[in-house]
Amino acid sequence: MSNIIPEKGINFKVYLEGRDLLGIAEGTIPNLEEMTSEVKGAGIAGVIDSPVLGHFNSTTLSLTWRTVTSDFIKLTAHRTHNLDLYSSLQQYDAGLGIYKTVQLHVYLKAIPKTGTTGNLVVGDVQGTQMELEIPYMKIELDGKERIELDKLNYIFKVDGVDYLAQVRSDLAMN
């Protein structure tokens, strides 16, 4: 009997326009924080912080390099950059007593927001950092598309269900 326990990320790689970004020390995948507004009044016992269907607050990717690199410099250009983040995730199958891995692939269209070149410290990393705005994100887990968010084209899919399809139709976008 299978009893999968997700454990950890084994390692990851970041690719810019299909080419490996060297020197990345850490990456923070964007959070999905929905836009909300309060609903209150007659017939409601209190306040509900109601999400706006398929709409999200700013989604950002944070990358940290050990030092300033040419790839860091390239990412500061004022244009959309295509990034692919790949991670190998470790799982333990307690039923079979074996380890296995699954691939996490996060595809992003990224626009630079902030960049810090870090600190100059003898014998240590600089901690060069960048934050990028993400208007488009697709997450695949173990080869299956799980989430797609396209803010500019009114697409928000979770496990194949497009929660903005009717909104696009209502706006005469289909």
What are the residue ranges of the model-derived segments?
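A contiguous binding-surface segment within folded domains or other stable secondary-structure elements
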Residues: T60-K113
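Polar/acidic, low-complexity leader/linker segments enriched in S/T/G and N/D
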Residues: M1-S37, Q166-N174
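A positional/architectural concept
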Residues: A25-F56
